[in-house]
Amino acid sequence: MKNLIYITSVIFGFLYAQNELFIPETMSGNEFNLSLQNGTTQLFDGDATETMGANGGNLGPTLIFEQGEFVNINVTNNIGEETTIHWHGMHISPENDGGPHSVIMPGETWNPNFTVMDKACTMWYHPHLHEKTNEHVTKGITGFIIIRDDEEAALDLPRTYGVDDFPLNLQTKQFDATNQIVIGEHGDNVPMVNSTIDAFVEFPAQVVRLRVLNGSSMRVFNLGFSNNSTFYQIGSDGGLFLDPISMDRLLLAPAERAELLVDLSDMTGESIELKSYGSTLPQSAYGIAGLSTMQGVAPSGYNSNELNGNDFILLDINVGAQTDNPILTIPSLLVDVTPIDESEATLTRNLQITAPNMMQNSITGPFVFDGQSFDMNVINQTVQLGDTEIWEIFNMSMVAHPFHIHDVQFYILDRNGVIPPENERGRKDVVLVKNMETVRFIAKFEDHADDEVPYMYHCHMLQHEDEGLMGQFIVEGESVGIDNNITLPNDFVLFPAYPNPFNPTTTIRFKLVTSQQNASLRIYDISGRLVETLLNEKLIAGEHEIKWNGGNNPSGVYFISFETGEFFSNQKIILMK
């Protein structure tokens, strides 16, 4: 029987009482004032916990936006240090987006304003200051954004906030002996919902809508109910589906959102639990029983964390009486969804997630895109306004990464060439890329362009993001050509191997700018085992060419690892016999 972990507090043999689920207040209209501030919160009996919040000492209000409305927001920084606020998932201009360049100094007010262009969905806001995102989010500066539109309003759905429509921010955190939040370690063994430990809530005996956010820094949840009842996902990150999708488990990575309908109409007086089934998480997801492999050891504290590999309770649900005018049925249809056809793409971009070099720990990180750690002064990609692009994300590390891109909602095309499950076919801004997996998605970059202010793309495991697994792109308003990596390493260029796929020989070309530069070229297999060293010597400047004959190796995926000086690049090749 799979393990079930009950997270409780015990003193002198008595259990602390459960805590009623905190439901954030709402703000609506056209003018919004947010004060970011420090505070303390009584999360445990004993020492109060130092926290941060918006318009309070912990968490922030739920902002309700109407599609087509112009909103003006004043964000005042009262936490005593620099921060930012990012409107996660929203299609807005880069100067309003709230990325790491939009720093709010202590005591100052930032004033973003924009027209809400997104469809009805559940989004959220959080800090995005480079190297401080994890701390500021984990300490509590997060809040929901609910966007409404006419299409959603015409549907027979629950939408009375806090009555039959509930926001659920799921997190796990680590605390020290004095009940203070620990940042950047891996002992996150305390589940929380809306910053409530051992949370309980009463839902009415009818159809209830859950707006679920994985607000954790690192952990992937595998959600389901203790009675294994069917629930219905009606929307993902960027909007509603064509029709509800029935399921009994939902994988939710950090920063992903899901709108769920749960039919409790026959359960008056009963109780169930919302749980994470960590015992059945997919391989490489943060939260499995162990991450140690030949490529490295698990992060410190990970293997002793009792949540990892186990099932645990997030929320106790008591089913009470129906409300007036309850919703009692699950709708059969929702809204029109028109995915972007692959034929509309004019460009495919390829990004690889790796450790900085092949010999580093591919479990703990740090991790990088295309061999380069995040640099605020480097624009990694340039996109043309109006273009439709395919982005291909290949994860060469041994841990799954939730990839997030600002500005756009995308449609997942495939995972390792396989069409994604139904609930991943809607509008998305986060996708979990498992180890040794390639995910392709398609997006159209429209409406907003700025030659100077960039958008971000990054891993949404906040520790990885802070450590450098992030890049930035600008959207240009004029079609002047694609400039991939405006600031390139000036030591080398690694050209695409040709042919690829190949049998049995492929040609690898590279360029060195300076002479007497030591260059190494190695081939690894998919498990990270060194297959062959093709080059490890000093070379003169210019273009060089090396052929690799894989005839003595089995068919499969291999990786070219090229290093010179402090720079590193790699490339996937496929031997097909």
Name each model-derived stretch.
Residues 5-7, 11, 484-498, 502-577:
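C-terminal outer-membrane/trafficking sorting elements
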Residues 84-86, 222-224, 402-404, 520-524:
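Beta-strand signatures of extracellular beta-sandwich domains
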Residues 18-254, 260-261, 280-282, 291-355, ...:
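Histidine-centered copper-binding motifs that mark active-site loops
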Residues 87-89, 95-100, 104, 233-245, ...:
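Active-site pocket scaffolds in enzymes
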Residues 284-288, 471-473, 569-574:
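Edge beta-strands of extracellular beta-sandwich domains
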Residues 126, 275, 458-460, 559-563:
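Extracellular recognition modules
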Residues 73-75, 212, 393, 506-512, ...:
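Aromatic/hydrophobic beta-strand junction motif of beta-rich domains
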Residues 120-124, 267-274, 447-456, 554-556:
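Short glycine/proline/serine/threonine-rich loop/turn segments at secondary-structure transition edges
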